[in-house]
């Protein structure tokens, strides 16, 4: 005959014995008649399943981590603004006097005389080929035809002025020089009928043609030297021979 009547009856006895706090050995025999005697407690069972996560705890204090290595140097920044000018430096010492080359006064005088002689020859050549000299005036023409304003500009470029005869000799010299009618440095642009030179001085010598000046076209403010040596008033915008005078 088997010691345990049946397996289900045995399990029932084990459960009743595990969860009863006041059941003694005698009671257990009454409940489980198949159990002969009370034994010692059995071994612990396997751990149960993990429970649910608890509530979030408070934030902890920062940790004391290790300091990292120093990184490489950064790029150079843009240049700054220029600083203020410094104070002037101390004055330097006075230098030694310079040495002037020894000049031979006699040699300088001879060279100066030779230069003056050469300039006189050049002046004669110019007078013979291009111009006329009367007293301290030298008259020259480039043979070009242009307006009065352009003649003034041309003469001023060479530090000269438009030819203005102040006597019969100068008027005759200009007449012999020109082959075309030429402007003179005389005008009444400022005051009609009152002809003056380019400085503004009134004329002390005139040689008007018959019936001139007549201002025929109401704008004849400039003066022309005709081939016969007489003067005629003409518009300044007309083109005639350029003639300059150089002081000598």
UniProtKB/Swiss-Prot annotation:
Residues 1-20 form the signal peptide. It holds the Pfam family Lectin_C. One of its GO terms (biological process) is complement activation, classical pathway. The modification 4-hydroxyproline is found at residues 47, 73, 79, 82, 88. Residues 134-245 form the C-type lectin domain. It comes from Trachypithecus cristatus. Residues 75-87 have a biased composition (Pro residues). GO terms for molecular function: D-mannose binding. Calcium-dependent lectin involved in innate immune defense. Binds mannose, fucose and N-acetylglucosamine on different microorganisms and activates the lectin complement pathway. Binds to late apoptotic cells, as well as to apoptotic blebs and to necrotic cells, but not to early apoptotic cells, facilitating their uptake by macrophages. Oligomeric complex of 3 or more homotrimers. Interacts with MASP1 and MASP2. Interacts with MEP1A and MEP1B and may inhibit their catalytic activity. The coiled-coil domain mediates trimerization. Keywords: Calcium, Coiled coil, Collagen, Complement activation lectin pathway, Complement pathway, Disulfide bond, Hydroxylation, Immunity, Innate immunity, Lectin, Mannose-binding, Repeat, Secreted, Signal. This is Mannose-binding protein C. The gene is MBL2. It is found in: Secreted. Hydroxylation on proline residues within the sequence motif, GXPG, is most likely to be 4-hydroxy as this fits the requirement for 4-hydroxylation in vertebrates. Disulfide bonds join 155-244, 222-236. Residues 49-61, 93-102 have a biased composition (Basic and acidic residues). PROSITE patterns: C_TYPE_LECTIN_1, C_TYPE_LECTIN_2. Residues 43-111 are annotated as: Disordered.
């Amino acid at each position: 005959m088997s010691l345990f009547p049946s397996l289900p009856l045995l399990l029932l006895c084990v459960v009743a014995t595990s969860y009863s706090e006041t059941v003694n050995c005698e009671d257990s025999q009454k409940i489980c008649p198949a159990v002969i005697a009370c034994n010692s407690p059995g071994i612990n069972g396997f751990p149960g399943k993990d429970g649910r996560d608890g509530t979030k705890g408070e934030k902890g204090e920062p940790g004391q981590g290790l300091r990292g290595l120093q990184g490489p140097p950064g790029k150079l920044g843009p240049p700054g603004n220029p600083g203020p000018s410094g104070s002037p430096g101390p004055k330097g010492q006075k230098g030694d006097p310079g040495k002037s080359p020894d000049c031979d006064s006699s040699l300088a005088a001879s060279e100066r005389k030779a230069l003056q002689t050469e300039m006189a020859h050049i002046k004669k050549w110019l007078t013979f080929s291009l111009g006329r000299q009367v007293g301290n005036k030298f008259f020259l023409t480039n043979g070009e035809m242009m307006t009065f304003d352009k003649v003034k500009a041309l003469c001023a470029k060479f530090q000269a002025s438009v030819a203005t005869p102040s006597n019969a000799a100068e008027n005759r010299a200009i007449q012999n020089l020109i082959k075309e009618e030429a402007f003179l440095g005389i005008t009444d642009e400022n005051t009609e009928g009152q002809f003056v030179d380019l400085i503004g001085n009134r004329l002390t010598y005139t040689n008007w043609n018959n019936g001139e000046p007549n201002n025929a076209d109401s704008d004849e403010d400039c003066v022309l030297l005709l081939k016969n040596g007489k003067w005629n008033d003409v518009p300044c915008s007309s083109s005639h021979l350029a003639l300059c005078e150089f002081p000598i």
